[in-house]
């Protein structure tokens, strides 16, 4: 069974050792996202996985694709658009101090500016058995919401299983 997801790949920056941003000059960098997390776990159990999304047409996009491949996620359906990636800083909580997350430029990310016409949903659906549509695609921008709904409709027409997270 091949399971795929439609959603955003983001770049997470995290200070080391529960430090706050103003307490460090170092950050850890990870490519993350709901779809990435889901597919990486399924790939760990030897299921075939793929992500359909957009990444920037630059070194960040290349690094994002490499990160997906390391996790066992096919990047065959990862296209390029624009030059930004959604990113956020996650300052991990400690004791009674809660975790704080600060997002950057998410609406202008490669995924955020993508629209249904940027994807070959028919060819994609011909190769997968199940599609997970990440909740962020429904709420990030009108274009991503429309693309998610079109993908769901086409998946239904192709008799593919569809699941969502909200």
Give the residues covered by each predicted segment.
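A generic secondary-structure signal marking the coil-to-beta-strand transition
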Residues: 1-2, 9, 85, 99, ...
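General beta-strand structural signal in soluble alpha/beta enzymes
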Residues: 5-6, 77, 103, 162-164
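Conserved N-terminal subdomain of the carbohydrate kinase-like
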Residues: 48-135
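Amphipathic, non-transmembrane alpha-helical secondary structure
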Residues: 40, 118-122, 126, 146-149, ...
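Glycine-rich phosphate/adenosyl-contacting loop at the front of the ribokinase-like
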Residues: 1-74, 115
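Conserved beta-alpha-beta core of the PfkB/ribokinase-like small-molecule kinase fold
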Residues: 130-166
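Short glycine-rich, flexible loops that bind phosphorylated cofactors or substrates
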Residues: 13, 111, 139-140
């Amino acid at each position: 069974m091949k399971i795929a997801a439609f959603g955003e790949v983001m770049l997470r920056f995290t200070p080391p050792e529960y430090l706050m941003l103003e307490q460090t000059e170092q950050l850890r960098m990870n490519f993350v996202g709901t779809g990435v997390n889901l597919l990486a776990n399924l790939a760990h159990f030897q299921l075939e996985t793929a992500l359909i999304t957009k990444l920037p047409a630059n070194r960040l996009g290349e690094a994002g694709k490499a990160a997906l491949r390391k996790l066992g996620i096919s990047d065959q359906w990862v296209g390029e658009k624009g030059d930004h990636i959604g990113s956020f800083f996650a300052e991990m909580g400690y004791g009674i101090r809660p975790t704080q997350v600060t997002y950057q430029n998410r609406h202008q990310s490669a995924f955020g500016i993508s629209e249904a016409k940027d994807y070959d949903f028919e060819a994609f659906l011909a190769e997968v058995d199940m599609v997970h549509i990440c909740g962020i695609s429904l709420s990030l921008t009108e274009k991503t919401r429309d693309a998610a709904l079109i993908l769901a409709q086409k998946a239904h027409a192709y008799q593919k299983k569809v699941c969502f997270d909200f």
